[in-house]
Amino acid sequence: MNATRVLCVENHPEYMGALKYMLDAAGYEVMAATTGGQGLRLLTDLHIDGVLLEYDLPDATGSAVRAEMKRIKPDIPVLLFAGIGSQTPFLLRFFDSYLRNSERPEVVFDDLDT
């Protein structure tokens, strides 16, 4: 049985390291990207089962990257990974779920596995 492959698009090394560590420990295979463009290339080139996507990326917004990901692979779950504040209701209309950067990734495992 192959591990679920998760693409993490996050430009902060400390968050990326924590996500990778926790997802690896839970049995996920983690692919890492630090820009929206890099994430889109990996999504196009590799089999990816789910995406954790930072909203504030250096080259694009999470909404723009998510829209392109859904164009490429309409059924892929794309979960927002960010500090959620007053923009929560607006942003969540565009994503399948979300993970606050202060939470443990286990809270979204069910979303990644569907």
Regions found by a protein language model. Name each.
Residues 32-50:
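Acidic, metal-coordinating helix/loop segments flanking the phosphotransfer/catalytic sites
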Residues 48, 62, 90-104:
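As written
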Residues 54-56:
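Active-site residues of response regulator receiver
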Residues 13-31:
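Two-component/phosphorelay signaling modules centered on CheY-like receiver
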Residues 35, 61-64:
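Acidic catalytic/metal-coordinating carboxylates
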Residues 41, 63-75:
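Short amphipathic alpha-helix used as the core "switch/output" element in two-component signaling
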